[in-house]
């Protein structure tokens, strides 16, 4: 309760217009986000830095940093909210059947509105657990090649071009168009070459040709990163070329960070870092897996066994430089600053969205429209149907 009490005092401080009387530079809204993040991270101990690299982060009370949980979903409307009623849209595979870019952008915009309203209300009620945040691990832009894959309905189908086009509209709608603040944070997943089989996803080593990699599996990620400025990427469970995706030289360093110049944050899929040593058998233990993941640009460990908690020891033993930890923590705090989480509500354009947008008539009407649009009639020209026994 003590951290909640302190957090409430911070909210009162900001809401009463006293935010200009800052104690630290990172609280000064006149500075650039980059300078504010640099100042904040410079004040953290190594233990505090590492604590911010798991999906459920604790408060840093001495600096007034509230707790935050990164995990959330909005594949077709805000997901997994038990105590709020939200608008549910067709599954992405149905959205793809509409071929309607405007409808998908509007759906994502409406979803961000509902997510913002929930976040503001949950914050007032001191709800800091999973699925109340503004970092949505959506869209799923994997390629649906095999109908036996049980999560294919989360995708926009088998076409790399269409997936990229619709994925961009999703990001545009969700993140908004404010030059400073994100309406919500989108995250392109699962990077990369992740299209089943589901049962062995934690240990499967994908083998595809270089042509297929670039022609089929990477185009949508390229489009969302270089054109739509998606703020997050989730690295996948599987391995590619014998190395787990979250610690893969080609995917994470050469392509994502260097060729595409991605500056956002990367989260692991939940438990993917533990898979390095448990199932892929590419690393001997937790600490080596955690170090390798961070060195390859994975910033956030979606918790299972919380592999990243070993990073404090790794720094003290000289296995990784603290500067590499700083890079990841700065990327993470940059997202939170871009979401306006450290600014007075009256400075952030999305903080006044009311709860009555949840399941509003406008949103429900659009969901119905998209459902109608998604119905596809196959031409039965040669009387293929009904199937003969």
Place the predicted regions along the sequence by residue.
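Glycoside hydrolase catalytic-domain context in secreted enzymes
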Residues: 17-389
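Bacterial Sec-dependent N-terminal signal peptides
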Residues: 1-23
């Amino acid at each position: 309760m003590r951290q909640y009490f302190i957090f409430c005092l911070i909210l009162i401080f900001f809401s009463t217009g006293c935010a200009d009387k800052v104690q630290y530079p990172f609280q000064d809204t006149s500075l650039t986000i980059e300078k504010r993040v640099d100042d904040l991270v410079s004040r953290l101990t190594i233990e505090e830095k590492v604590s911010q690299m798991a999906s459920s982060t604790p408060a840093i009370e001495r600096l007034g940093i509230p707790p935050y949980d990164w995990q959330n979903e909005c594949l077709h409307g805000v997901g997994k909210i038990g105590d709020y009623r939200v608008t549910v849209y067709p599954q992405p595979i149905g959205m793809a059947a509409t071929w309607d870019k405007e409808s998908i952008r509007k759906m994502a915009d409406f979803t961000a509105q509902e997510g913002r309203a929930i976040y503001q209300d949950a914050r007032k009620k001191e709800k800091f657990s999973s699925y109340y945040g503004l970092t949505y691990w959506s869209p799923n832009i994997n390629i649906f090649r095999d109908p036996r894959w049980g999560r294919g309905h989360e995708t926009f189908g088998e076409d790399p071009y269409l997936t990229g086009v619709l994925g961009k509209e999703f990001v545009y709608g969700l993140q908004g168009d404010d030059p400073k603040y994100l309406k919500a944070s989108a995250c392109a997943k699962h990077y990369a070459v992740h299209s089943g089989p589901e049962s062995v996803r934690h240990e499967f080593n994908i083998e595809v040709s270089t042509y297929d990699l670039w022609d089929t599996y990477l185009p949508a990620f390229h489009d969302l990163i270089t054109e739509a400025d998606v703020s997050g990427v989730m690295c996948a469970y599987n391995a590619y070329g014998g190395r787990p995706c979250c610690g893969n030289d080609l995917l994470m360093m050469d392509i994502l960070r260097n060729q595409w110049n991605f500056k956002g944050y990367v989260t692991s899929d939940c438990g993917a870092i533990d898979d390095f040593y448990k199932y892929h058998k590419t690393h001997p233990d937790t600490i080596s897996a955690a170090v390798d993941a961070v060195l390859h640009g994975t910033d956030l460990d979606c918790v299972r066994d919380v592999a990243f908690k070993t990073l404090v020891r790794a720094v003290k033993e000289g296995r990784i430089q603290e500067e590499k930890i700083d890079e990841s923590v700065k990327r993470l705090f940059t997202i939170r600053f871009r979401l306006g989480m450290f600014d007075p509500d009256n400075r952030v354009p999305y903080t006044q969205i009311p709860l009555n947008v949840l399941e509003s008539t406008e949103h429900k009407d659009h969901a119905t429209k998209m459902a109608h649009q998604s119905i596809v009639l196959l031409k039965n020209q040669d009387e293929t149907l009904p199937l003969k026994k």
